Every structure is written in structure tokens, then in C-alpha cells.
Amino acid sequence: MSKRHFDMICQRHLPLIADRIIGLSLSEHEETPKQINLFYSYLLSFNKFIQLRSLSINGVRSYKILVKITDECHHLYNLTHLNFYNCSLEDNQADFPLLVNNIWSFSKLVHCNFSIDIKGKKFFPIPKKISSSLERLSIYGSTLKLHEINRLFEYTNRLKSLSINVEFDDDNNNYILSLFPTLIELHISCSHQLDISKMISLLQNTPNLRRLNVSLWFNFLDGHQWEQIICNYLPKLKIFRLGMEETLSFDQNIEERVDELINSFRSSFWIDEHQWFVRCIIQKKTIHLYTTSKIFYNYDSVLFGSIRSTDPQDNQQKFYNNMTSIVNETFFDQPIPSYIRLPNIEYLWIKLPINDQFWSIVPSLNRLNSLTVVSYIDTFQSQLKTLLNRAPCLRRLCITQDAPLHSQMLLFRYANPSVRQLDLRDYNHYFNKEECIRLSHSSLGRQCEVLSIMINNRESIIYFIKKMINLRSLNIRCEDEKYYKGLALAKNGNNKYPDEKIQNKDDLIQWLKDHLPSTCLIVRNPHWINYILIWI
């Protein structure tokens, strides 16, 4: 969304319909920086959204904003769904329990996704207020100690669904887990070596569990162990999704270990009674085992021929039909059997020149949404042109190169009518004024909505905004500014946000505010201080 449209919605429409809106989502990222602050500048608070049932907040980096939002939610008496996604706070003085207690005090809240990461605070604080309504809770970015699960349920006594990262090996052994009879769905993950008996003690207290999703890194339970756990403690379980990984030492035989694991999941319990099939994937000395109903994300590191399954209908082609992302640009450099096809690629990183076998393996790019071309040089222009011509749904094009080219002229000749995002920040070149003009008038430039680029003259920013009529967001690095170097020194590797006096010396920001329309929002990129974000 452009800032012009967002301004219009906030100024003209929201005041008239605020009392009828039932769902609202606000997000702060590179394309919409400071969106929530801007929202508050127009509407001051959420108090007018009296019918609001669902509120989603994404990417907030301000503790004060989060406290303000959770305070105002007390007045939203119909709010049942609250989602905080990808919120990251560098302020280690932030009062984590205050945020949690605010949320637990909402009278009708049923569903909460809590993804708030506060620097230096690993563990989720147990609330001190009782929620009589919360039934579904997902916690990301922080960990829950096993011995505190009792207390979580004491303050969330209607909880039916829970998704958490658990630390099973905490030091407190002087506790007995209570029964959790309300719980019917559980998603647990553990990213360290665990005491298996403690995980079993959790599961044996969930007698009404119907859905279980388990992710274990550095831990393995074989099929016999899982069968015993389910039969003894989870009589009502209907859906079971499992993901585990184990890294072997160099003197261990990985093929024998895989055979042992696969065979342990071949009993009638797995195959006949439940039809819960598992798949084993070998990556060097690491074994990934997961139920075929669970998504495995590290596709592009998988060597062909290293897949085993208990499903008689499973095969390598079925596995690769589900592959939608390749972010390893050397993926096609490995030997690939000629019968393998990858028909559903949506996100692709590829290094030029394209391997000879690429087009036989990838027969169609009709679903390709994002393309990153690595080591681009003019010699391979025809290959890039072919990629673009065969990708009718491509939205994002990113071009990276290690060494600068003598000329950028060929870049301006490429075309694809569906591309709306152009990322040249790793192009290893500062575009001069003439090149920026050519880019603005090129086919890709005219249709571009989101542009990331390095330039050597700040005047080109003005030209981009005037001439690229569809542009709504700029992520730009300017060679003729020195502010970010001083800013990096001011941070000294410790503080994420600079001293206010340093911020006030940001000459380029001030220059842009003086020369661009006042409707543009101009800020430093919080993730890359040498880039400036302009929301148009």
C-alpha cells in the first residue's frame, strides 16, 4: 500500500466507519515504515473501534507503542483475536510482565499469537492475572520452562490449544505437573538436548489431546518409543506431526542408523491403525525424520537419492513436487537424476550461467513469485531474459553480483510485465544520475512499486519519486552521505539506537525532508543504518 492511500484511508474513511470495523491489521516493515505511528497521528487511539474483534500488529520495535496498544485494548470489549507478529525490542529495560498481564486481563480474548522478542529476556513471564477466556495461545521468540507450565494453566484455565518452545532441562526438579484436561491441541519445540522423561511427564498429563505437533532438534525418539508414549498416555490422539533431527559423529554409519529409525516406524500401529507415515532425509551427517504431513523447509540442501519413507505411495518425485523454494544458488550444480521435476517453484535463487540441466528439471516457472539472480554479468543476458520471459507471475526481481560491471546499459533493457519489486542493493554498483534516469524510463522502472538501490547522487532520489509514477516505497543508500559512518561509530557495537544528538545530525534525512513532498515519510532503515526508507 502506498502512503498516499494509507493517508486517505485514515483521513477520509476510518473516522466514518471505525465503529463498524471488526478486523484491523497494521504492519511496520521496509515498505510501510512507521505505519502504526502514522495511524496514531490520525486516529489517536483504538477506542473508536468498538466492534473490533481481531487486531494484528506486525514488526513493532517500540516498547511504548506496544504498551499503548495493550492498554487501549482494554476498551475493545469485543476483541477475541490478538496477534503480535515479529515484534523485536532492543530495550532490555522493557517490562515484559506488564505486556503479558495486560493481555491476560482482556475479558473476551480467545486467541492470541505472541511473537515479541525482548533483548536479553529468553523466558516467557508467567502472568499474574487470570484469563477466564483465552483458549488458544501461541508463543514465539521466548521459551517456557517446564516447571512453569502448571502456573501458566493456573492463570489460563480454559486453554485448549498451546504452541510453545519448552526448556525441559531446567534446574527445578521439585515440582509435579498437574493434569491439563482442557488441552486438546499442543505444539511443542525444543532446540536443545532434553531429558526424555521430562517430556513424557508433560505428555502423560494431557489425556484429552487430539492434535500433537512436536519439533525436536538434537534429539531422537524412535518409533517404538513414540508408539509407547501415544498408547500409554494419549488415547484420544487423532493427528500427530513429528519433526526430529540428529547429527552423527564421523565414525557412525548413517545408512544403518536411518534403516533402524525407518524400521521402528513400520509397525501396524503406524502403518495400519493410523497411517502415520514418516520420511527420513540425509544431509551430510545429519538425519531429519518427520511425518509426511509435516512441512520440511530445508529442501534445497537435500541431496538426491537421500530420501527414505514408510509410505508405499511416497517417492522422490512426490517429495520434490512440494518444493516451492530454492535459496541455495548452487542447488543445480549437483548431479540430479533426469527423471526429477520441480514444477512448483515460487522462490528461486540461481547463479549464472544456468546449468544445462535446469530447464529439463524445471519445466515451468508459472508459479515463480520471487527471483534472485546471483553473479550476474552481461555475458549471460540471454539467460536472464529467458528466465523473465518464462515467469508470468513474477513479482520480485533481485540481481546481485560480486564485481561491478563496466556498463549497466543492458540492465535497462530487461522486461517482465508482472514485476513490481526491484532489488538492486547487492548489485555492487552506485548508480549515477544518467543511469538512474535510464532506469526510471525503462520497462522495469515504469512499473516498479518497490525499489531498493544504491546511488551516488541524492538528487536522483527526487527524480525517482517524480518520474516513477507507480513507486510507493524506496529503500536507498546514497554514496554522498557520511552520516551512517558516524552512526556506526556511535553505536560502538552495543546500542541498537543511536544517541539523539547523533540522530539530529542526519543531514541527508533533513535534506530529503526539505526537497521531497511533505507527504513522504522518511526514516533510517532500522535493520541497515546505511539505508534510508521512503514511503511515498
Residue ranges of predicted features:
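Eukaryote-biased activation of long, low-complexity terminal tails and linkers
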Residues: 1-536
